[in-house]
Amino acid sequence: MAKVLVLYYSMYGHIETMADAVAEGARSVPGTEVTIKRVAETIPADQAAAHGVKLDQKAPVATPDELANYDAIIFGTPTRFGNMAGQMRTFLDQTGGLWMKGALVGKIGSVFASTGTQHGGQETTITSFHSTLLHQGMVIVGVPYSCAGLVNMTEITGGTPYGATTLAGADGSRQPSQNELDIARFQGKHVASLALKIAG
């Protein structure tokens, strides 16, 4: 049995939708147990409501220490200037105790992301996220080109070999496309399959 955690932060719901697709893909692998959780919102509730932040997300809030309970963790974040969102950074900055114990060494780490525009930092968001995972000793997994959606040239679409991505649009009105969700499902299935092999 391999335990997979899909851990995300989503301000307007795009990454939440992608997280559900990632989890769906992971659950398609027999012998895996998949959990979806999110990191806490750090924006004060009144300001979050005033700016249209999606506060009704069903996933429970994770605590840093519980990351050690999983064989693979698939992280999802929107971009902030080519990096992960501050809410995710705040969460990961609380994992020093796990680092001291080597609690995440050898576990799979994978990342998916969203950006406002086609060239808004999808790849840098994921690759900069990898630095934290490498410091924790995690095994990085992306999306191989055996995923057909990565070479889709018929539409504007997210999706990178580093991880699944979606384009939200500058005003957040664009929702994840079928191709982007298919890549997210592929990533979840790919990570879960590898986690099962590692867990033995």
From Swiss-Prot:
Disulfides per UniProt: none
GO cellular component, one term: membrane
Annotated binding of NAD(+), by residue: Y12
Pfam families recorded: FMN_red (PF03358)
Protein residues bound to substrate: W99
Catalytic activity, reaction form: a quinone + NADH + H(+) = a quinol + NAD(+); a quinone + NADPH + H(+) = a quinol + NADP(+)
Gene3D superfamilies the record matches: 3.40.50.360
Residue ranges of every copy of the Flavodoxin-like domain listed in the record: 4-191
Domain of life: Bacteria
InterPro entries: Flavodoxin/NO_synth, Flavoprotein-like_sf, Flavoprotein_WrbA-like, FMN_Rdtase-like_dom, NQO
Signal in keyword set: no
Gene Ontology molecular function terms on file: flavin adenine dinucleotide binding; FMN binding; NAD binding; NADH:ubiquinone reductase (non-electrogenic) activity; NADP binding; NADPH dehydrogenase (quinone) activity
Free-text cofactor note: Binds 1 FMN per monomer.
Binding residue positions for FMN: 10-15, 79-81, 114-120, 135
Assigned keywords, A-Z: Flavoprotein, FMN, NAD, NADP, Nucleotide-binding, Oxidoreductase
Cofactor: FMN
EC number: 1.6.5.2
Family membership noted in the UniProt record: Belongs to the WrbA family.
Protein name listed in UniProt: NAD(P)H dehydrogenase (quinone)
Organism encoding this protein: Paraburkholderia phytofirmans (strain DSM 17436 / LMG 22146 / PsJN) (Burkholderia phytofirmans)
